[in-house]
Amino acid sequence: MKRHKICKIIFAILAVFLCVAFYELIGICITYKKHPAVSDATIKETQNIMSVAGRENTERAVIIEKNSQALLERVRLIQNAKDEIILSTFAFKSDESGKLILGALHDAADRGVHVRILVDGMESWIDMEGNPYFYGLSSHENVEIKLYNKANPLKPWKTMGRMHDKYLIADGKIYILGGRNTYNYFLGDFPGHKNFDRDVLVVCDEPQKDNSVNQLWNYFETIWEQEDCRYFHNSKKLADRQSVKKAVLELQEGYQQYFEVNKEKICDTDYADETFETEKIILLSNPIHTQAKEPVVWYQLGELMKNAKERVKIHTPYIICNDMMYNTWEEIAQKVPDFSIMTNSVANNGNPFGAADYAKNRNRILETGIDIWEYEGGYSYHGKSILIDDDLSVIGSFNMDMRSTYLDTELMLVIRSKEINKQLEDGMMEYESVSRQVLDDGTYYDPYHVKPIELTEKRKRKVFLVQHLLGWARDLF
């Protein structure tokens, strides 16, 4: 009798779990499996964007390639801010680099700087809830933290709409934008796993109405005020907790140590010798609602690439495309003589979903006419950039996959500048020198004599399972 009762309880728990899973699955599929088309308004807007791409510009820029430099430049912006700091990030952890950023932000707030932070509501649920380091910042009188689309299992129709933006603005005059999240994988040179990515720093001493810094600031204000963004634990009473006091003290001491070691560089506010002139900088963005999105950024990037005269070079960590996306690449390949893409090899890809889909669809990608280079550097490459001819560069958060195309908020910065283009080309080539070109027959062209990463049996099994169990959801990962 007792055993029978236990079986009934287990069965009831399992039934509830399956019902919840079915509810979540139905809500997600109904909302996100249908992909919106490009609107006439986007087509018209894209034509206008291209027509003003060469107008006079007062902004200067430089690309940030190394993770150690990326951390230092963020601290530098925060330390020298006088009035306002805006930080938007997909993921924010309280590891070594995350604590340094938290410490720098807390120090700025102590100086009277108004700090606003926006974090994706799924990642924050994992990394920030119950965390005294984040409570120490959110309870500060000069700090506001909001979460975009906070995770809610009762609303599966909003689950997949994530905020993937990554940028930092100081005083409405200088910003960093790119693909780096706010933790050790991307910032600093700490032991352990790393992801290689890329940012661009933009400076404008006297911003004008249509400068990119104002485009980005206006974008932030719009998303900050929308109803899907809710405050994160802003009670001032949190500061009285012993765990929070201890965390704040640790942040202050850790930041002061980092500041003293790097003081000369951090306090340098003259960017003139470090940056390059630009003719025009344009911000491309996806819709900011949480439903399935019109593929605005994908379309605009495609049109920019179709207008290339000689070359287009794409770097992306993942390639997960549908027919519309493949068709775009086919059109580019027909128009542009030199069209290539570099992505992680199956063995080198840190994302099992990206690795599995690429392994299955590599031949379909080759059929578009694009040349594929596989990165074999040992650490997963996370850079999201496009090089067009000798004067146009595109850097940001957009992956060449269906999630970036239809589900996430995304930002890409388009920069017209021969100097930035050359800097981007040099940065790309550093990674391409550890890559091999995939040939149509499945063999490789290996001009750099690269030793490929071993595809282990464990990775093979993982790829197989993802392909066969989750392939139906390839547009959701």
Where are these regions (language model features)?
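Phosphate-binding P-loop/Walker A region and its immediate neighborhood
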Residues: 146
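Charged, low-complexity intrinsically disordered terminal segments
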Residues: 2-143, 153-164, 170-477
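Short loop/turn segments at beta-alpha junctions that line or gate ligand-sensing/allosteric surfaces
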Residues: 150
